[in-house]
């Protein structure tokens, strides 16, 4: 029978645990140390000023300090009567502070920045001109559209007034037993010819319509005058008056504008 192990013996009690870090722990430590070194290096760089910054600071410091008597040029000015802080010029109204020094640090040639600025201004001015011209063109197009629309509306109104005059003329002529209009266009032309109409009559009507050279406005003016003279009627008033005196007294005039 095998001997049982004694868990209270020294072989178990005095065993020391192996607490050495494994591979993952070593990686974490190295990564943390590397980050700390980078942080310290970045802080050091931030604390150190560049050569250009140091030159700029020394230059600004020198320009801020006034020249002392030890300066030969300033001593010569004092002998000529100049006092520290006095304005330049005979009348004493010149500048007091020295002209600021603008040090060029870029690699571009002299006048390059001025050229770029002028080109940018020219480009901006060209853009503004294009916008202005485009705006003017849009305004002209809108105005022309309004004019065309108004002309179209005016034309449609004239055509409507002419049809009303032709319809009224046909009714009033018929009431006076006038069988044939004074002019063919005084009456509304039927949209469809009757079957009894001969081919000769059709050709005659077509010739009459083709030979018309009067505009809608001219036809309306002529027909309006006929209705007023022959029937004492005004299409805009919609009234047949008793006599010429009644017509002239109560009708505003022979045009549509007179009735607005």
From Swiss-Prot:
Ranges of Acidic residues composition bias in the record: 192-210
Coiled coil location: 25-61
Domain annotation G-patch: ranges: 69-115
Disordered: region residues: 33-60, 187-212
Record's keyword terms, sorted: Acetylation, Centromere, Chromosome, Coiled coil, Kinetochore
Modified residues (N6-acetyllysine): 123
InterPro entries: DUF4187 (IPR025239), G_patch_dom (IPR000467), GPATCH11 (IPR039249)
Pfam families per record: DUF4187, G-patch
Assigned GO CC terms: kinetochore
GO molecular function: nucleic acid binding
Domain of life: Eukaryota
Subcellular location per the Swiss-Prot or TrEMBL entry: Chromosome, Centromere, Kinetochore
Family: Belongs to the GPATCH11 family.
Xref: PANTHER family: G PATCH DOMAIN-CONTAINING PROTEIN 11 (PTHR21032:SF0)
Protein name, per record: G patch domain-containing protein 11
Gene source species: Bos taurus (Bovine)
Gene behind this protein: GPATCH11
């Amino acid at each position: 029978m095998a001997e049982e192990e004694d868990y209270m013996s020294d072989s178990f009690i005095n065993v020391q645990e192996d607490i050495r870090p494994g591979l993952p722990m070593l990686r974490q430590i190295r990564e943390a140390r590397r980050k700390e070194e980078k942080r310290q290096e970045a802080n050091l760089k931030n604390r150190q000023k560049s050569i250009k910054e140091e030159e700029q600071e020394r230059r600004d410091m020198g320009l801020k300090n006034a020249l002392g008597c030890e300066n030969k040029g300033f001593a010569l000015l004092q002998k000529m009567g100049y006092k520290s802080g006095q304005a330049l010029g005979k009348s004493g109204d010149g500048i007091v502070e020295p002209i600021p020094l603008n040090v060029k640090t870029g690699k571009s040639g002299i006048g390059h920045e001025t050229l770029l600025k002028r080109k940018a201004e020219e480009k901006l001015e060209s853009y503004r001109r294009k916008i202005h011209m485009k705006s003017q063109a849009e305004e002209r197009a809108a105005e022309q559209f309004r004019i065309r629309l108004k002309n179209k509306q005016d034309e449609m109104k004239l055509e409507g007034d002419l049809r009303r005059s032709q319809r009224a003329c046909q009714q009033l002529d018929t009431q006076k037993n006038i069988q044939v209009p004074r002019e063919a266009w005084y009456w509304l032309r039927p949209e469809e010819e009757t079957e009894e109409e001969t081919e000769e009559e059709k050709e005659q009507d077509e010739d009459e319509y083709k030979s018309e050279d009067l505009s809608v406005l001219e036809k309306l003016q002529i027909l309006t005058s006929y209705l007023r003279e022959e029937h004492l009627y005004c299409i805009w008033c919609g009234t047949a008056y008793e006599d010429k005196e009644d017509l002239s007294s109560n009708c505003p005039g022979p045009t549509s504008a007179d009735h607005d």
